[in-house]
Amino acid sequence: MKVFYNEAYTAAAHAFDTTRKSGEIATAMDEGCAPGCEVVDPIDFVDLAEELIEATHAPAYVEALRTGEPYDLAGSQGFSWDEGIWDMAVNSTAGVVAAVDEALATGGSSGSLSSGLHHARRAGGVGYCTVNGLAMAATRATELVSGTVVILDLDAHCGGGTNELIGGDGRILHLDLSTSSFDSYSPDGDDELTVLHGPSD
């Protein structure tokens, strides 16, 4: 199984588990902890990822991610902007898109060591999520297959950013099972949100 990753996933200077864990996991995989998995660089999908980010997120936010200005918008996901943020966002998105393309091309499994996705909204980052590669990859998948694309989000927090970006798109079914009400939302259409521990979390 191909699992996509490159060092740009960890290009952000802010040292935090969301910005670092993919590198540690890739190293462990390279050392044989996941037999049958091959770590693959998504470099061939970087140009497409840039196009998808520009099509999905507001122009002012994209420019802030590239330049750091305005500073508050550039760091809206919760950590300080630096020049590595844009590379991280683009390459992490490239990995998710590459994994979708690989799975559809082979009919098998594929993955990406991307993180920090489902809280990001059109106009800014939220909850340590910079851009929403999850919504972008699902939208990309609708261009490659007929039928319904399913997002199964099992993160502890709700994916309110994903809902904002793809909620109501009849080609995508968003199923969100969470243990915390952080970033909760009212699902659209057939989408579902279940929070296991109630609204006080």
For each of these PLM feature ranges, what is it?
Residues 97, 101, 111-201:
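Conserved alpha-helical scaffold segments that buttress catalytic/binding sites
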Residues 1-138, 147, 201:
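Metal-dependent C-N hydrolase catalytic cores
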